[in-house]
Amino acid sequence: MRFDVEEFKKRAREDFEHAWHEGPSVLTPAGVSGRYPRLRYTRATPHPIFEIVQRLRETYLAMGFDEAMNPLIVEESDIYRQFGPEAMAVLDRVFYLGGLPRPNVGIARKQLDEIEAILGRAVSPGTEEKLRETLHGYKKGTIDGDELTHELAAVLEADDAAVVHILDAVFPEFRELAPESSRNTLRSHMTSGWFLTLSSLWEKRHLPIRLFSVDRCFRREQEEGPTRLMAYHSASCVVAGEDVTLEEGKAISEALLSAFGFTEFRFQPDEKRSKYYMPETQTEVYARHPVLGWVEVATFGIYSPSALAEYGIGVPVMNLGLGVERLAMIAYQSNDIRQLTHPQFFPQEISDREVAGAVHLREEPRTVAGKRMAEAIRATAAEHATAPGPCAFTAWKGEIAGREVEVIVEEPESNTKLCGPACANEVFVHDGSVLGVPDIEKWATVRQEGVSTGITYLDAVSSLAAARIEEAARCGEEAHVQVKMSKLPSDVNLRIEEYAMRHITDHNKKVDLRGPVFLTVRSVIPEQPTR
């Protein structure tokens, strides 16, 4: 908090050592919620696939490749041009685009009667004609589907809800529509787009042309599995020029993949022979990873002149492609691409550190004075914890809400101590469980291997007492706070965030914050408030 600079200058000149020791008095008490591990600076987490995409983009750009965006929608005829007789087998793996046809809706007397019944009024001849024109415009495509309801509402002078009812009840043609496929497909591999792009560029740029694209592709797999997705990312590049050879693929593989920690490379002919590549050029790239050893990471080859000729491309083209998800699996050492791509649909793992940060106090004082009161209660109770009852100790005196308040920690009964044995218990998270444990040999493993929340039972109860006293003082009342046996987190003023609690129960872990606390705190307010 702010402090008086001149005052501290004066104190330092008069008694430097005393002024130095008073330094902490200018600090605002953090309170339990302001302590680590609840207080932390966090970095937002990028999605692993998009992180690899970004690294690939940066690497390609650093290698001198220009970025391109290839067409995502490819006509069926282009597949035949690229694959030749193999096209039929390839088309079995592509998604065709379809849509709902626009019905030819007629308006007879029967439909008009039903519309009038819904509207509760007659439809004039002029409105009838406009209604026909609107439906005809929708059929012809001059009115979009998402505008139809609004346009009909304007014609009929009715609200959208009535129009939706009319469309559903009067025109069953809309409900009976079935999708119809077109001859357009979603790109199943980046090569389909490269032919289209290069056919427009190869005579308009200086050769060699070096382009890359990291983008979505779609493949109609029979089912998705640990290594296969229907929607995936391809990181692909092309080099087009008069003197392009297969050696380009080897050099690019090393330059690109060395950025991901691969150190050695091996190239071998691919047993699969795609017809858009020249014979004997389709090559698999294996790279040595320092942790995983030799893994297959990419494929390259030189496009067949027969396929290039279909697009009027008159120079050799080398193409290299790799699956981004495959590279991400290697980088993150994952064994299921589905979990890496869509982690939200799989069980979430939460570390002990994260669970510890999810343990909070239910009630805390709000003011600086209240926080100092909580610290004083804790310190006084800890200092006199073993004092035999009956006993009472003044923990704090100060002003709250314009009133002088005295806070007393006490034990009114005989044959007991000021604090129960569990007051010194500290809350740890160990192997997913939240445990309140004392500092004894039995719990040494938990205290050494677990993650501390930085909260003891005494911390939590002291904050509870300070919060209640603070609130009572605002109302001009005294407070009496007593905590006896703890069985639940709420008994010692603790709460665990819902997501962490769900993780604990889902994994059959436990929350054990039991123990005899037995601490009593009360406040005393003089009759007259301070002025």
Swiss-Prot record:
Gene3D superfamilies: 6.20.250.20, Bira Bifunctional Protein, Domain 2. Substrate binds at H189, M190, T191, S234, A235, S236, Y276, Y277, N319. GO terms for biological process: translation; tRNA aminoacylation. Signal peptide: none annotated. It catalyses: tRNA(Cys) + O-phospho-L-serine + ATP = O-phospho-L-seryl-tRNA(Cys) + AMP + diphosphate. One of its GO terms (molecular function) is ATP binding. Keywords: Aminoacyl-tRNA synthetase, ATP-binding, Ligase, Nucleotide-binding, Protein biosynthesis. Pfam families: SepRS_C (PF18006), tRNA-synt_2d (PF01409). It comes from the Archaea. Its EC number is 6.1.1.27. The keyword Protein biosynthesis applies. The keyword ATP-binding applies. Catalyzes the attachment of O-phosphoserine (Sep) to tRNA(Cys). Belongs to the class-II aminoacyl-tRNA synthetase family. O-phosphoseryl-tRNA(Cys) synthetase subfamily. Homotetramer. Interacts with SepCysS. This is O-phosphoserine--tRNA(Cys) ligase.
